[in-house]
Amino acid sequence: MPSRSPACRPRGRNRRSAADAVARPLALALILVSTLPRAAHSQDLALPPVQPRGVRRTMTCDNIPEPFGTRSRGASRLPGFEVTCGPNREAMLSIGGDAYMIDFVSVSGSYVVVFAEPITQVCYDGKGKPTPDTGTGAKSSEGTTTTFTWSLEGTPFTFSKSNKLVNFGCNRTLMANFFIVPGDSSPLYTSCTTTCNTLQISGSCLGEACCEAPMDQVNGAKAFSLSFERTTANGTGEEDGTCSAAFFLDKDETVFTFSGDEVRPLKTALLPPGERRMVLDWAIGSTSCEQTQSYTFEKLCKYGTCVDAPTGAGYLCKCPSGYDGNPYVSDGCQDINECRNYNSNNCTYQNLCNNTLGGYTCSCPENNIGDGYRTGTGCNTTLATPVSPSQQPQGINVCDHPEKNPCTYIKYCIDLEGVVSCACPEGMSGDGRKNGRGCCFSCQKHFPLDTVLGVSLVLMVTTTTAASCYCWAVKKRELGRKRAELFRKNGGLLLQQRFSTITSQGEDQYSSKIFSAEELKAATDNYSESRILGRGGQGTVYKGILPDQTVVAIKKSKVFDESQVEQFVNEIAILSQIDHPNVVKLLGCCLETQVPLLVYEFISNGTLFQHIHNRNATRPLTWEDCLRIAAETADALAYLHSASSIPIIHRDIKSSNILLDGNFVAKIADFGASRSVPFDQTHITTLIQGTIGYLDPEYFQSSQLTEKSDVYSFGVVLAELLTRQKPISAARPEDSCNLAMHLVVLFNKGRLLQEIEPHILAEAGEDQCYAVAELSVRCLNVKGEERPAMVVVASVLQELRRSFTIDQAVGIKDESIQENSEQEEKHLHESRSIPSLQSSEVSTQCSMEAKMSSFC
């Protein structure tokens, strides 16, 4: 019995009383079991293994039974029964070119349970358009009708009537024909139709978005064809994330992951495709035992007997009567001990059942008469005792002589030619004998030992199960209450209200989803270390896979300020409406955890920081990439500052917060430090937050956050792209460990070229490099009001992109780089025409940056 942990103990007097009510019978059961006679052998207590198909087992290549086999074990002796091994040694069965994981093989029942993909499955995207069919059925179309077929011809398998055909989706009709022989003119037909009134579904499959087509009449079918059509064209059920599917399912399995008392959205209702099991019957060959040559099945069934397959074609090997096991292997058939189980034998007294090889015998207690079998004469409690000739003189009736009479009551004695029977009067029980139990009105009833053991085990299992269920129910209720409290505390009700407002205003295409804690726990494999994408100052980011196979990034923050709940909810609602190609899309959040979780779209190609500073990258960034990434980032920031519904200041712009997708398109991420600015304000006052090296010195001094703080941080990113150096580096001299300050000083001295990455300078040319450097210096101005707006920065970068594209088109190439002294002299002259920072401004910036330079 599992120990009762403190976590599952109910709180309060009433709950403790309920727990005691469960625990007392359990204690009594344990006492009863501990007092049983120790003479009972452990093997007599063993219960036969019960393996319902509804419990997942998954066969491995090491325990797959004959007639199935692998090449490493000499393979199977029969065609079609060979299996292969998966990555984790799971047994895989090949049928028609597809591999199916084997869950269970029944030798005695001649069936195999496999995990099967849907016959057809179509899901819908955010615009209600169907995605490509992911089913395994062979597809063909004629007019408006689409047919899916599947044939098991040439294999030892047939479709089992232990399955059901499931039709899932809105307003769908499923019609299927099963053929005993492919092309049969009299197929077996089954069908069902679904309707839809809402996008919610209960745990039942009775026609509302789900129906089951029975297969009870399908026996021995080798092929089938299926049509799966819409019955209406109203579009219900074609919303983002919903699916329509038709699939086989073991009729012992449930269609859904929840009970019939719950109601859930359609998109989360189905079992995952890899969890659906179907049953296939199997048989050897296609002829009966009589039609098969005797030496063939004598060779295959030499450890058992041949019987015709119940599916109609082929034959099977069975163990002889009284034996059970695997008749396809040597010593596979083992004698059944019928005496262990009351239902396996026919004895009146179970303790007088004697097991024999291939059978058993029954007997009666001493001095009872009968054959001992329940369906025979049984055992008569009226005892028959033969009397020896010495006790019964010739012609004398023993019952007439009290000294010779063995019965308690003389008148209930019967002497039949020397055989004396004793009985008890009506209403009394016993054997009626003087030297036996006699006769009494309330004789103690003696139960056989196995009956006592059985009752004790049942009592113990029942009470243990009851206690476990009660504990589980208490834990589930406590967990639900805690999650509801966290949901309320984290602003869940307020956020639901905001999302409802957005939807009512016709902006639902931008609204996000509120995920449950269980959904995200499953998506991240319980927040496995292997799913971590990165760690930062704000928290940890995990890779998650939702039930519809959408890959997402889930951010788990370190801390959460409960006093800022309303502001957090407002910002979530705002971010959920941001629709810009260069901003990572917020898909939703979870408020049922101690710290809220944010769910973003997954960007696969890492961060700009990794691509800039990884010298061994397989595809280094070109100057064209750098210009485009910078322009895209600037355009996204300009959108956040001015074009979104409420201006948003990111507050932590840096190269590691700029993600790149597979085409190196920039995406701004990590809005954990972001703040929205009311339209009637130019700044907000807040605690200092950001990353050293990117942090605006003016914001650092005044705590006043403005849009120009993002401009400064973006200027540092431009400096990174030019120099390929990190914002803070101990490798540089102490007075220039800050890249921003270092770049400004070099620019004003006309010595910028010595810090620009050589291959960037060669590819971009001096004019482009100086133009970007000038823009970076303007962004790094110590006075925020003199920095350009992000709209201006984005415009300049777009113009530089066009200029670079034109230069490449006409084949203009930069001249060879001259001697460093000539370069410096030339650009010192050019820099006089470029507005530079005054020496006082540089000094001010240096003093501000000096406070942060200690971080070097």
UniProtKB/Swiss-Prot annotation:
Parts of the chain that traverse the membrane: 452-470
GO molecular function, one term: ATP binding
Coiled-coil segments on the chain, per record: none
Composition bias type Basic and acidic residues, residue spans: 823-832
Regions of compositional bias (Polar residues) in chain numbering: 833-844
Effect of S576A: Loss of cell signaling activity
A GO CC term assigned to this protein in UniProt: external side of plasma membrane
UniProt keyword list: ATP-binding, Calcium, Cell membrane, Disulfide bond, EGF-like domain, Glycoprotein, Kinase, Membrane, Nucleotide-binding, Receptor, Repeat, Serine/threonine-protein kinase, Signal, Transferase, Transmembrane, Transmembrane helix
Protein name: Wall-associated receptor kinase 17
Classification of source organism: Eukaryota, Viridiplantae, Streptophyta, Embryophyta, Tracheophyta
